[in-house]
């Protein structure tokens, strides 16, 4: 089949290589005193983020092994891309900062374990990537002195899932934490609360399971969502932006963060504009004459516009509703 040469995809893969390079640089700078052949910690002594990334890498290598056997190299490449970009760079490296830069929550032994894990995971990631992107992985291997017993990555063995710990419960715990952080970030974005502004969080209807998960992950949530306090409440909450995580309500009190009345007026004005645009687009799409005579790409473009405007309308209505909730 014909494969389109897409410049946007080329740019995306260039960004991926840059991200991988920066990740390797971060690991190297933060593990200067750690030997590359250091023995990894046993599963029971690993911190939550370290056990999580090993578990995710274990599943990745299992998936790669399966897809190589059926010659689905495309699925191998896609799964590596998703793991490196999302799990390793966007989440794990950020989680390790909470450990490495901590002044009170984590001991020196904890920090050393995480540094060893950073090196071991990056080592396996580079070796797993090497058949797909050989030049950049070889360059990283040599440029950052990422050399164990092999001078070149190409003569290193492919990583095996058996060398990694795996714990399904840990994956669930971090996924819960990710949803918690993502919900807070989404509220920040929708309510125009700057990421640099520290905020308090209130929790309503939290189950015992939620509280147990919070107890294990709160230090990471506070760092990644820039939160200075998380409290549970049973009384009526103050005027807040609300998000749901299962049956639990996550609330960000709005007093002092935004001018509520001005923001409501701005959103109501924006909603009217979106409703007018949506009505105009839908009228054209409902016109049978137009649909039968217009070029296919024009109709498809209008359908896409209608979908995007509908999504924007729902989002703005939700923001206005949140300002009225208490």
For each predicted feature, which ranges?
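Gly/Pro-rich active-site capping loops and adjacent beta-alpha segments
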Residues: 1
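Feature 926 captures the class I aminoacyl-tRNA synthetase adenylation module centered on the KMSKS loop
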Residues: 4, 8-326
């Amino acid at each position: 089949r014909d494969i389109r040469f897409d410049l946007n995809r080329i740019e995306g893969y260039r960004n991926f290589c840059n991200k991988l390079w920066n990740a390797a640089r971060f690991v190297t700078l933060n593990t200067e005193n750690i030997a590359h052949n250091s023995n990894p910690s046993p599963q029971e002594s690993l911190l939550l983020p370290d056990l999580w990334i090993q578990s995710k890498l274990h599943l990745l290598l299992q998936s790669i092994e399966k897809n190589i056997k059926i010659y689905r190299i495309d699925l191998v490449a896609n799964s590596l891309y998703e793991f490196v970009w999302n799990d390793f760079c966007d989440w794990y490296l950020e989680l390790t900062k909470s450990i490495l830069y901590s002044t009170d929550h984590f001991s020196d032994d904890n920090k050393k374990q995480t540094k060893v894990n950073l090196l071991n995971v990056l080592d396996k990631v580079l070796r797993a990537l090497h058949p797909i992107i050989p030049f950049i992985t070889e360059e990283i291997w040599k440029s950052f002195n990422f050399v164990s017993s092999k001078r070149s990555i190409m003569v290193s063995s492919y990583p095996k899932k058996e060398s990694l710990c795996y714990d399904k419960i840990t994956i669930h715990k971090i996924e819960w934490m990710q949803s918690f952080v993502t919900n807070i970030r989404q509220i920040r974005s929708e309510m125009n609360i700057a990421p640099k502004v520290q905020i308090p969080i209130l929790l309503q209807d939290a189950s015992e399971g939620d509280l147990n998960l919070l107890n294990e992950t709160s230090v990471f949530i506070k760092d990644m969502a820039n939160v200075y306090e998380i409290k549970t409440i049973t009384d009526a909450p103050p005027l807040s932006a609300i998000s749901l995580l299962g049956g639990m309500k996550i609330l960000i009190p709005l007093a002092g963060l935004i001018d509520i009345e001005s923001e409501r007026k701005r959103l109501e004005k924006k909603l009217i504009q979106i409703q007018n645009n949506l009505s105009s687009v839908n009228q054209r799409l409902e016109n049978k004459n137009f649909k039968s005579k217009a070029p296919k790409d024009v109709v498809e473009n209008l359908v896409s516009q209608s979908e995007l405007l509908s999504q924007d309308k729902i989002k703005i209505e939700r923001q206005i509703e949140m300002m009225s909730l208490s």
